[in-house]
Each structure stands twice: as C-alpha cells, then as structure tokens.
Design a protein with these regions (language model features):
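Gram-negative outer-membrane beta-barrel transporters
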Residues: 401, 571, 578-582, 600-699, ...
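C-terminal beta-signal and adjacent terminal beta-strands/loops
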Residues: 4, 532, 629, 695-700, ...
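N-terminal periplasmic accessory domains that precede
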Residues: 86-91, 136-139, 157-159, 174-179, ...
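Short acidic/polar hinge/loop motifs at secondary-structure boundaries
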Residues: 59, 181-208
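Short, acidic, small-residue-rich periplasmic hinge/interaction motif at the N-terminus
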Residues: 28, 32, 40-42, 70-74, ...
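Membrane-embedded beta-barrel scaffold of Gram-negative outer-membrane proteins
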Residues: 352-356, 362-376, 517-529, 553-617, ...
Length: 781
C-alpha cells in the first residue's frame, strides 16, 4: 500500500515538474492552399500526424520551443513556438519529389504532374544548391535529356533533347521565362540579363520538345524559372562565403521577409573565379529584389529588379593533342589578345499581376524591360577576330485569361493569351589592334556597324477537359510571327549595303495531349506537338556585306508516350517517356568561297529517344537518427540520325568548296547514352551528405562522324553540418568536384575540322577541385 501511494505521489510530482502543453494547427500546401495529410509533427518526445483535412493536435513538454514538420512530398520545416502558442497555420513547400502530389506550371496547367501530358523535368531550391553554387549546371544536368555546358563561368549553352551543331555560343532555340515573364530575346536566344545563380532561383521546370502551342516559337523546349522566397511568416538575414580551387570565391547576402500580404527578398552576390585554364576567368556581381504582394483577395502583384555586371575570359578550343599535353593552356591568340567579354552590364525590370474576376475567371499579365551592354574582343587567329561593342534594349509582355467551368462530369479550363517582344540592338565591330601581347586589345578600323530591330508576337489558345473515367485532354495552338529590321550603318565604296526587312511567314503550332489516370498513383500520357524555330540573328547576317534572305525556319513534329507514378507506399517515383521527333528544313553551316561561314536550310533529322527518372525515398522520419535518405537515377537514350543532310566545307589546300552528303550519319553533338545518379542523406543531428555521378557516352564531333569525343565519368560530393541555436542557423560545408580527376571537355566545338588540321574540338573542363564555406542565418521573426 505504501509503495502504491509513493508511486502515485511520484507520478504527480513528475507530471507537475514536466508540464505539458497542447498545440493545435493546420498544414496546407504553400502554392495550392489545399490541406496536407500525412505530415509528421514532432516536438521533444511528442509526435503526431496531420489528418485528411490537414489538422493536427500534439502534446509536448513546456520546455520545447519548436516543432519539426516533415512530409515525403515537402521540404522539412522547423516552426518556432511563441508563449502561449496560438493555433498554427503552417504552409509547406513542395520538394518536387512525390509525383502524386507535386504540381507544375508547365503548359499553363497548374495541376498535378500526374495529370499533365508531356515530359517535364523539375528542380527545387534544395536540388539546385547541392554543390558549390557557382551555377546551376550540375543540377540541370541531372534532368534526363538536358545538357548545360560552360565556356567559362557565366558563359553557357543549353540543349534540351537536341544538338548544339548550330549553336556556337549562348543559348539558342530555348524559351526562358522568369515568373511567367519572357526573358529570352525575340529570336529565341538568351542574353546576360538571365543569371543562372542558385541563390536567387527557387525552382526550375524544364518542358522538353516543342512547346509552341502555349510558349511561342521553338523546337528545343522551355525553362520556367521562379525566384526563391522567404519562409512563411519569417523575417531573416542570411550571409555566406565559399572558397575553392582555381581562385574560386563567392559571397552572398540576402534579406527575406514574409507576412500576411507580402513576401520580399533582396539578394547580393559577388563571385570571382580565376579559372582552370589560362584566360578563363569568370567574375560577376549581382543585386536583385523580388516581391510578391497580396493587394486584396482578388489581386496579387509580383515585381523583380535585377542588375548584373561582370566579365569572363575565353580560352579557346584545343586539339586532342594540345589537351593531352596541357589541358590548362589557352589558345595562344586568345591569351595574347585577352579574348573575352571584357565587361557586360545587364539590367532587367518586370512586374506581373494576377487578378481574379471571380472563382471561374482570372487574368495573369506581365511586362518587362531590359538593357544590356557588351565589350567583347573575339576571335581565334589573325584571320578571324574582331572587337565588338554592342548595346541592347528591349521590352515586352505576356497576358493570359483563364476561364473554368463545370458541366456535369466534365470540367473545362480555357486559356487565351498573347505575347509580344521587341529588341533594339546596335553593334559596332572593329579590327583588333594589340602591340603588346597579353594586354587588352584596342579598336582598329571599323568594318561592321548595324542596328537590328527584332519583333516577335504570339497568340495562343488552349482548352483542358477533365473527362469521365479519369481522362484529361489538352488541345491548344499558337500563331507566331518574327521579323528583323536591319539597318546597315557602315559606309564604304567597297561595301554593299545590306539593310532590309526580313519577315518570316506566320506559323500555327498546335499541340494535343491526353492523360489517363490508372488509379491514384499511376498515369499514362501521350502527346503530339508541332514546333517552329526561326533562325537567330547570327544566322541571318553573312558578315560579308550581304543579308541571308533565303533562310527560313526549321519545322518539327514531335510524338511522345509516357508513364509516371509512384509505388511501394509512395517511396518509389518513376517518370518514363519515349519520343520521336522529325525535323525538316534543318539549318546547316555553309563555308563560302571567301572562307566565311553562312547558313542555309539543307537537311532533315529523325530523333528517337527514351528518358527515365527514378527516385526512391529510403527514409523520411524526422525522429530517426538518419531522418532523410533518398537515391535517384536519371537516364537518357538518344538515337538521332540525319535523314537528308548535305553541307559544304572549304578545302584550304585547293581553295575549293566541297559538298558532302551526311545522310544516315549520327547527328553531331548528340551522345547515345547519358546517365546521372545520386544519394542525398540528412541526419537528425544536422549532418548531411550528397553525392552525384555522371556518365556521358562518346559523342560525334563532326557531321562526317570521323571524330568522336571519348566517353567519361564524373563524380561530385558534398558534406556539411547544420545547426540551429536559438535564432541563429549555421551551415558549414565542404565538397569535391570531379573526384576522379577525369580529363574531359564539357563543352565541345563541333565541326572544328572544317577550319584546318588539327581540329580544335575541345574546351577542357576543370580537374579535381575542392571548395568549402559557411552560411549564417539570423531569424529576426
């Protein structure tokens, strides 16, 4: 009896000593505002799971001042508790992993990926920042069918399911949108106003293949980029510094705040890179502000202002022998004349509005303007060089009206909209003069001066029908037009004025997509789409006093069939797509009798492929020592062939032009197999680790398929420790890139054999390199 009384007394004493509190709340999706069920809420020894309507109730000790919210489909979030804690409204941000819940913007659907027809690659902020944060190249290359390459830090090429045969520099045939505002130029190329910095990007969606039905001209694909945002209900300041091999250093600072009606973030980035190779530096300074304002329940405003200034060196292509001898060397002409973008400045401003007229009718509109300047000594020899001074300014906008209606068992959604872009470009090119090798060159005689006004318009309409038996049908199309108004300002008795207006015929590009849900966790989709890819400015200008008025756009038709879903209690996600695309009127380079290169329509290709993305969530439990562990694999198979393809090359020994037939050959620059795989691990104590491996098959380097780049493998890894101490969050990390010290060239210069022997195909990438750094975050609210 005494023992029983003593037990009761001790129980009451301990219960009073460790007082309990009950916390209630609701968890919703940040984007859709829909309730999130199955989220795990932990605090001290307390643990519970959110219900079907997102509600939860948890009992925790009084001394516990935070809750950890985790879900397989969302980013883990730590919530600080006030005293006393009110009813908690918690919004979770999708981690873009679970296909049954993740929603996408692609094709203006704004619906679950499982209900969307088409191949779409997804990257969230965590995936974009798995490495050293120099750029998003390592992350983008984990998407099957996507290849991002770099001449140097800040100078990129991107291919989506395609060859870079006609893309000597920059980004071609890929449409880019920032928060639904178009940022590519009217001709489909991209300029320096687009900064691929992981610190300012919140998510990336990649639409593969022709997307002209809703996003204007292009056969390559679309990048939909959204900026990062402040965490819900939080005000914080963050700073970080990273240092690494080959003179890499990076400083980043940001201020973020989120309240009931506003989400504002300001970023500052200063990055320096001396470069792996000689004359291969890359420096940039970026400042930007992004804001999202809720004016009233019917109206949301988004604003961005960004400015980038920088410079980058161009080391030039090397032959295989030169690369094997010393991969860090620059082409001698490039080093002697500091071939580079000596300085670039780019500013972009955009504002967009979402207005809801009713529950069934809304409008989204955005406008932008940008300004850019370049100082660019270029070339590779005394026979090919120049000093370009260029300035660009432009403006444009995009609008869409969305109407929803329900009739019986059929739900309909109609999108009608348009897009307009204008760009004013003035360029003056001089001969390069340099009396002292290794110093900056000077302007010589002017040999080209022009003004180009580019205009692009698109009108689109799309209907989505949710049909009985879990069928989802999408039918749409766009009507696009592009024109160049060129004014030749160079006056000389020996020069032919090539001023003129080049207007391409308007083109209608339709798309049809169908999805069938096979239960809650599996869907099959099929689509057919037409593409229309007008030639960019560098294919219009022959650079010999003539205008290439005979060239016209490439046309493509694409067929896709795919299967996506998740199995094994939402642990295994898979997304598999097969496709076949026929491209006609392919633009090919032609070497002219005077040695210059022009372009013409002279080919067609057949492009067959398979893409697969698999993700397995081994562990997702915030209470376990290893709280998160997932593995993933990305694979692409590409069987691209020239159907009818003839080119011309110049025989320097006989000074004659030779016509070559490459029909039946593999398409230049497309590797048959590419694969990436990785593991991501997080622990309860704050230690985290990730590793990524890449494999790229041998790649044909010229149209004749007589030269190939060797296959190669690359491995990257990162290790870090995160810790929260009251209002401070610390992240210390270190990593290694190219752990195997593989000698490879990420960026290849195709058909370089046309310029003599030995051909300089290679632009060697960095060998084994290391980095380390720290981030500090102060939570003010």
């Amino acid at each position: 009896m005494k023992r029983y009384i003593l037990f009761i007394f001790l129980s009451l004493f301990i219960n009073n000593l460790i007082a309990q509190q009950i916390i209630k709340g609701k968890i919703t999706d940040y984007n859709t505002k829909e309730p999130v069920s199955g989220a795990t809420i932990t605090g001290g020894s307390g643990k519970t799971v959110s219900s079907e309507n997102g509600h939860f109730e948890i009992k925790i000790p009084d001394f516990v001042k935070s809750l950890i919210i985790s879900h397989v489909s969302y980013e883990t979030q730590e919530i600080q508790l006030s005293d006393p804690s009110p009813f908690l409204e918690i919004s979770l941000i999708s981690n873009m992993m679970n296909l049954s819940t993740v929603r996408v913007t692609g094709y203006e659907n704004n619906r679950r990926l499982m209900e969307t027809a088409g191949a779409i690659g997804l990257l969230n902020a965590q995936q974009l920042r798995r490495g050293d944060n120099m750029d998003i190249l390592p992350a983008l290359n984990t998407i099957p069918g996507v290849k991002m390459e770099a001449y140097s830090a800040g100078n990129y090429r991107i291919a989506i399911r395609g060859s870079l045969i006609n893309n000597p520099w920059g980004i071609r045939n890929v449409r880019i949108y920032w928060n639904e505002i178009p940022l590519s130029s009217p001709d489909g190329t991209a300029q320096k106003s687009i900064d691929f910095d992981p610190a300012i990007i919140g998510s990336v969606e990649v639409l593969k293949g022709p997307s002209g039905s809703i996003y204007g001209a292009g056969n390559g694909g679309v990048l939909l980029i959204k900026n990062s945002k402040a965490e819900i209900g939080q005000t914080a300041a963050e700073t970080g510094y990273t240092a690494g091999s080959y003179g890499f250093s990076r400083f980043h600072a940001s201020f973020k705040t989120s309240g009931d009606n506003a989400n504002v973030i300001a970023n500052l980035v200063s990055q320096r890179y001396e470069g792996y190779r000689e004359n291969n530096w890359g420096n940039k300074d970026v400042i930007n502000i992004f804001s999202q304002l809720t004016v009233n329940p019917e109206r949301n405003l988004n604003l961005f202002v960004t400015h980038t200034t920088g410079s980058l060196g161009i080391a030039g292509g090397l032959s295989k022998e030169q690369m094997d001898e010393n991969p860090r060397q620059a082409l001698q002409f490039n080093k002697d004349n500091k071939i580079s973008v000596k300085k670039y400045d780019a500013t972009a401003v955009g504002i967009s509005q979402i207005y809801r007229f009713s529950d069934n009718f809304s409008n989204t509109s955005g406008i932008y303007t940008n300004f850019q300047t370049y100082d660019h000594p270029y070339g590779s020899s005394i026979y090919y060089n120049g000093y370009l001074h260029e300035s660009l300014s432009g403006y444009g906008g995009r609008t869409k009206f969305v109407w929803n209606n329900q009739t019986g068992k059929i739900s309909a959604r109609i999108n009608i909209g348009g897009e307009y872009q204008y760009q004013y470009q003035i360029a003056n090119t001089y001969e390069v003069i340099n009396d002292q090798p290794g110093t900056w060159p000077e302007d010589g005689d002017l040999f080209q001066s022009d003004i180009v006004k580019s205009k692009a318009t698109a009108v689109f309409v799309q209907a989505e029908l949710d049909l009985p038996c879990n069928f989802f049908l999408t039918v749409g199309g766009s009507y696009t037009r592009l024109s160049y108004d060129i004014l030749d300002l160079f006056k000389s008795s020996s020069h032919t004025d090539y001023s003129g207006l080049l207007r391409f015929p308007a083109k209608f590009s339709p798309r049809v997509g169908l999805v069938k849900l096979l239960g809650e966790y599996l869907s099959v989709h099929a689509s057919t789409s037409y593409g229309y890819s007008p030639p960019p400015l560098w294919e219009i200008n022959n650079y010999d006093g003539t205008l290439n008025k005979s060239i016209f756009p490439e046309d493509g038709i694409n067929y896709e069939l795919g299967l996506r879903g998740n199995l094994l209690n939402n642990k295994l996600d898979f997304d598999i797509t097969t496709y076949q695309m026929f491209l006609k009127n392919a633009v090919v380079p032609v070497v002219r009798p005077n040695g210059t290169t022009a372009y013409k329509n002279a080919g067609s290709t057949t492009q067959k492929g398979l893409e697969a993305m698999l993700t397995y969530q081994f562990i997702s439990d915030a209470t376990k020592p290893v709280s998160q562990m997932k593995g993933w694999l990305s694979y692409a198979y590409s069987n691209y062939k020239f159907r009818e393809y003839t080119t011309q090359s110049y025989d320097w020994s006989t000074n004659t032009v030779i016509t070559l037939d490459h029909s039946g050959n593999k398409v230049t620059g497309v590797m048959p197999h590419s694969l990436s795989a990785g593991i991501d691990l997080e622990t309860k104590c704050g230690i985290y680790f990730n590793t990524t491996g890449y494999y790229y098959d041998k790649t044909p380097l010229n149209d004749a398929n007589t030269y190939y780049a060797d296959a190669y493998t690359q491995i990257n890894a990162k290790f870090g420790y995160k810790k929260s101490i009251r209002c401070f969050q610390v992240d210390i990390f270190a990593g290694i890139n190219n752990a195997g010290n593989t000698q490879y060239s990420s960026l290849l210069l195709y058909n370089a054999d046309a310029n003599g022997v030995p051909p300089q195909f290679y632009n060697p990438s960095a060998g084994r390199n290391f980095y380390g750094g720290m981030k500090l975050k102060l939570v003010l609210k």
